[in-house]
A protein has these predicted regions:
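A cross-family signal for N-terminal binding/gating loops and helix N-caps
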Residues: 1-139
Length: 140
């Protein structure tokens, strides 16, 4: 059986959640992401696609983009748009699409459980996208 634990989360404050909510980063191209952030500056895309803060000639994977993502998240946290949990928590979520509802849990799990396939991956990912997301998270 998988070992899971609660974790400290930085999440949108309840009053900001509807403005922060965004579709996954990889369903937008750069121009679409930029338009979404212009329409809603609190959108998580302003962090998740931080290249929207730069001219188009700045590469999406430029180090400045990752630094900006961390700066924007910290600024939003300072303004109370995001809040840091004071105690570790589990998070339940529910997704409904085409009349089908799924319920899930977000928690920390053991790397060994993942490597031993006790925790199953939900999709095949590309290494370049994994590196991008890792770099994105490390600058917070």
């Amino acid at each position: 059986m998988a070992e899971i634990k609660p974790f400290y989360c930085v999440r949108p404050a309840a009053e900001s959640a509807s403005r922060v909510a965004a579709l996954p980063y990889d369903v937008y191209n750069r121009e679409e992401a930029k338009r979404e952030v212009e329409k809603e500056p609190l959108s998580f895309l302003s962090i998740d696609r931080a290249e929207t803060w730069f001219p188009d000639d700045v590469d999406t994977y430029d180090e400045r983009v990752y630094v900006k993502a961390g700066e924007v998240l910290k600024e939003m946290e300072e303004k109370g748009i995001f809040v840091a949990e004071e105690v570790p928590c589990y998070y339940l979520y529910e997704l409904t699409m085409n009349g089908h509802t799924q319920t899930g849990i977000t928690a920390c799990s053991s790397v060994d459980d993942y490597l031993n396939q006790i925790v199953k991956k939900h999709e095949n990912t590309r290494e370049d996208k994994e590196v991008d997301r890792i770099r994105h998270c490390l600058l917070y």
